């Protein structure tokens, strides 16, 4: 599943040419098939190893759809060797910081799982994993929205105009997240029982908290794009390294003291710090300005 996600450059291409609708549709198809298979496997009590199939399908189907769609298009001109070398150098120099930042994110989001397994046992880890899966299953909608607006944000030379676009997107992210949270509050317990069984009902209390964490994470993604827009690659990599270091004591203390609820709250705290305080040290305080303007709903 991770392999298909990592080689899926076609989603980036669709976002760049303002056709993120293709990404959204293919993601919905993949997610629907994945969840349907999960339900069939859980309902019929098949060997849990079969749950790896829907996980793979969730990323493979969108990749396959985008791959076929891309190769049906007529790609125009070939670039010269010199331009390719120059472009590859630029990708390498600017991309290494982003790679390090992404690795840091992957590490600090997994720290909780290691600590739950160590401090609370495998059953608790299973409950937490279910909550994580469901709380992030809808995030592709927000990711598509963010990606589709990136060209307009990166293409805008004036910071104030870029911030106005960011304000609107922040509000859309918050509204969609609150709608999903309301749905989870009403039907979350029912769907956990339907998809995973009665033993995983305790995941419901975690799901509500982790859903808010998902909102913060996506608001943080938008803020990170503003930082990249200002060439803050080095800042991002340093920030995420600090977040990894911070997440270890926070996760350990909360999990040891409060168990699974503590684990969920540790994610919430880390995502909130990453979104707010840690971003406010960036030059010109552009993220601070973005957040204050969002709270005031200042579109002027």
Can you say where each PLM-predicted feature lies in the sequence?
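Interfacial/gating helices of multi-pass transporter permease domains
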Residues: 48-49, 53, 86-98, 116-136, ...
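Membrane-interface junctions at transmembrane-helix termini in multi-pass inner-membrane proteins
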Residues: 3-25, 155, 212-239
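Hydrophobic alpha-helical transmembrane segments
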Residues: 24-73, 132, 242, 260-283
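Alpha-helical transmembrane segments of polytopic membrane transporters and translocases
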Residues: 60, 97, 112-114, 124-142, ...
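Helix-loop junctions and terminal segments of transmembrane helices
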Residues: 16, 135-160, 226-229
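Helix-terminus/linker motif at the lipid-water interface of multi-pass membrane proteins
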Residues: 42, 103-137, 192-198
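Interfacial segments at transmembrane-helix termini and the short loops linking adjacent helices
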Residues: 122-124, 186-215, 261
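Interhelical loop/hinge segments that connect adjacent transmembrane helices in multipass membrane
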Residues: 21, 48-55, 64-109, 155-164, ...
